Amino acid sequence: MARFAVIGLTFLLLLGTSLSARSDEETRERFYGNVVNSTAPGNGEGSIAKMFDRVLEKEFSENDSPEGSDGASFNSSVADQQAEIETVAKVTHEKGKRNDTQENNGTRPFQLQDVFSLENEDSDDMTLIDKKNNVFVMSNKKSKYPILQVDLRLISDLVVIIVFAAIGGIVFSCLGQPVIVGYLLAGSIIGPGGLKFISEMVQVETVAQFGVVFLLFALGLEFSMTKLKVVGPVAVLGGLLQIVLLMFLCGVTALLCGARLSEGIFVGAFLSMSSTAVVVKFLVERNSTSSLHGQVTIGILIFQDCVVGLLFALLPVLGGNSGLLQGIISMGKLLLILSIYLTVASLLTWSFVPRFLKLMIQLSSQTNELYQLAAVAFCLLSAWCSDKLGLSLELGSFVAGVMLSTTEFAQHTLEQVEPIRNLFAALFLSSIGMLINVHFLWNHVDILLASVILVIVIKTAIAAVVVKAFRYNMRISFHVGVLLAQIGEFAFVLLSRASNLHVIEGKMYLLLLGTTALSLVTTPLLFKLIPSAMNLGVLLRWFPSENSSPNESLQEKASLIEVHNRTK
């Protein structure tokens, strides 16, 4: 005991010495006096533990407490006119009261979504509802000290969506159907329009957005500059021509039907967007990304992703919120930024990227962990820069992949990124499925199904004619048209923005929303049926094989891609 007393006494003496520079004389005398008298039994005030607490109280005052903060406060935000005071309703999950009420009434039936609800757990989750019925989930609770916070709701939602996506993929794979359908249907089942296992979608959709980023990054790794030059004219000029034709057709139709011209132009721009994620996922499953029709389709899809920013700049003009001149200036600025971004990316491709990858290979001689992390970081940095410049995350991630594809480490990088891509791609496709309201589709299945058939026929015909104009054979043209026949997931964002700007009316909004959702569900089945139909003997003379084109230049294009694939 004497040895432990000496050790404790020495520790406290050293602590007192370190505090002497900031402590007054009276505190030191009281501190050391208590240490000397600490051996007196029964003296609670003079115990070492009590003294240690008083020293800590003196050292760390209330003003020194580092409170957890998000960098803003209520008073300062209102004073700086960064926020406005508004009445909200706070929804708390009081477990005791709720259980007592249920036991007394005995009327609340069991609901399956309660199994996945966090309301029965000792959770501090809080929900706020404003006067416009907007729902907000608290993400950063004020705390006296900085603590590690865990969002149990997000963890639960991710577990649900990943498990159901896996089940859906397994079931449809066993049935010989595309797993994309399984992902989409799994999302629709667990989403707000289904069994409501997931009701707060913002956080899940944000995490799932990485699926598109990594999907296009991996696509860029396979989509080399040589292939880009082969399909460049049809991708850029053909993609632009397809958008213009749809906008013109819908605009004329709107005028003939007595609707507003701006509404018709928006519908045409809306319908021109195709789903990059769904199409690319299908091409990857069929190992068709290197085929000629796959390259043409991917080129047009990438061009559409570039045009998304221009369409957002066009919406205020169509809504009458800004003049035509202002809209033209906004589009011109975006084109200038895009040119600068691509120029800088080209310079980095030949100067920085090869040296960077060689360094990562040297540092990753023992394990690929550092190389994998560096590749993901490079992809995310490029996507983030593109988004900050007013372009899109998708364009930035694709450009990052193309930059790395010019090096000898492209295949190695693809192997490292593929597992991450597959996980987040399934997560993203399932999150798209959560936007699909099964009850809404079923209640209006007749008009929505007719709309989907009309959209598929029109988009397939226009895309096939455009590709055929660039002297591709009928099989390739029709195949590309079918692949581009659906409406893309970015149409949901475009549609929401147009509704806020009053470009379209409520009924048209619901029609386009349901048509988009149903087209995404039926597209994978269409992908599976149409190619099989084209291989029927009676149709072979209308749809010859890709390599049987009578045009010599097309044969050179196909052979160039094949040679490049063998040497890559």
Swiss-Prot record:
It holds the Pfam family Na_H_Exchanger. Keywords: Antiport, Golgi apparatus, Ion transport, Membrane, Potassium, Potassium transport, Signal, Transmembrane, Transmembrane helix, Transport. The gene is KEA5. Residues 1-20 form the signal peptide. Disruption phenotype: No visible phenotype. The triple mutant kea4 kea5 kea6 is compromised in cell wall biosynthesis and has a reduced growth, small rosettes and short seedlings, and is sensitive to low potassium K(+) availability and to high salinity (e.g. K(+), NaCl and LiCl); it also exhibits a reduced luminal pH in the Golgi, trans-Golgi network, prevacuolar compartment and vacuole. These phenotypes are partially suppressed by the cell wall-derived pectin homogalacturonan trigalacturonic GalA(3) in the dark but not in light conditions. The keyword Disulfide bond does not apply. This is K(+) efflux antiporter 5. GO terms for cellular component: Golgi membrane. Residues 59-78 are annotated as: Disordered. Its main location: Golgi. Optimum pH is 5.8. Gene3D superfamilies: 1.20.1530.20. Coiled coil: none annotated. Expressed in roots, stems, leaves, flowers and silique. Belongs to the monovalent cation:proton antiporter 2 (CPA2) transporter (TC 2.A.37) family. KEA (TC 2.A.37.1) subfamily. Induction: Up-regulated by osmotic stress. Electroneutral K(+)/H(+) efflux antiporter involved in K(+) homeostasis and osmotic adjustment. Together with KEA4 and KEA6, promotes growth and development, and facilitates endosomal pH and ions homeostasis, as well as salt tolerance (e.g. K(+), NaCl and LiCl), probably by supporting cell wall biosynthesis during rapid etiolated seedling growth. One of its GO terms (molecular function) is potassium:proton antiporter activity. It catalyses: K(+)(in) + H(+)(out) = K(+)(out) + H(+)(in). The chain crosses the membrane at residues 154-174, 178-198, 201-221, 230-250, 264-284, 298-318, 334-354, 389-409, 422-442, 447-467, 476-496, 510-530. It is a multi-pass membrane protein.
